[in-house]
């Protein structure tokens, strides 16, 4: 069977342009879906009766051995969950961008100890550099300490990506947003929403690529 359109320059150009247009539309549709997912997930609230073995505080910047305002909000929220007996432990995550500086996890732990949280109820990993590593690196620590369920603590728009990662890592996770956030201003909120939608898209693209490659290597 012959396909005349493919045997002319105009026919080939038509199919090429149509393929590019469809690809762009697909990317835009996925991105729009991500924006909605990030927004919807960011407006979810933790059920009043929800409890877990531990609260996991996703890392954020630390300055001169002190938590940044964003990190402080996350730490205080995890402490509130602990003090209200909704979690039994607090897990801090996060490394350092520069050698010689105190890690985010160590800054969080230090602050929590000063607030009266017993050292035996604080766990941490201090080598991660991003959200995926935060959650991946705590997995063996959770297992070693018989922690079967967690509540992830972060800013609202961070949760769509955090949930996707937790799901891929087979973590039994709920999410709980900080009651206040430094991203409340409309401009900052919009920027954070766009940024997280973009990062979720990149994570999905990489995750789908890995799955396709795994399928090819298994069946090739």
Predicted regions and their residues:
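A structural signal for short, hydrophobic/glycine-enriched beta-strand patches
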Residues: 3-5, 33-194
């Amino acid at each position: 069977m012959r396909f005349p359109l493919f045997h002319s320059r105009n026919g080939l150009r038509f199919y090429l342009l149509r393929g590019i247009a469809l690809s762009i539309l697909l990317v835009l549709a996925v991105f729009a879906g991500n924006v909605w997912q990030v927004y919807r997930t960011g407006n979810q609230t933790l059920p009043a009766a929800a409890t877990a073995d531990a609260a996991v505080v996703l890392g954020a910047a630390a300055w001169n051995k002190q938590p940044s305002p964003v990190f402080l909000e996350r730490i205080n929220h995890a402490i509130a969950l602990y003090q209200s007996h909704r979690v039994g432990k607090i897990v801090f995550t996060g490394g350092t961008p520069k050698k010689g500086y105190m890690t985010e996890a160590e800054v969080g732990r230090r602050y929590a100890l000063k607030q009266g949280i017993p050292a035996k109820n604080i766990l941490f990993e201090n080598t991660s550099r991003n959200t995926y590593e935060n959650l991946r690196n705590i997995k063996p620590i959770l297992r070693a300490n018989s922690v079967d369920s967690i509540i992830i603590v972060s800013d609202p728009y961070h949760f769509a990506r955090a949930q996707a990662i937790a799901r891929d890592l087979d973590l039994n996770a709920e999410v709980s947003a900080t009651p206040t956030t430094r991203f409340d201003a409309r401009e900052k909120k919009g920027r954070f929403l766009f940024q997280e939608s973009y990062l979720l898209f990149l994570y999905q693209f990489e995750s789908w690529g890995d799955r396709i490659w795994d399928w090819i290597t298994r069946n090739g």
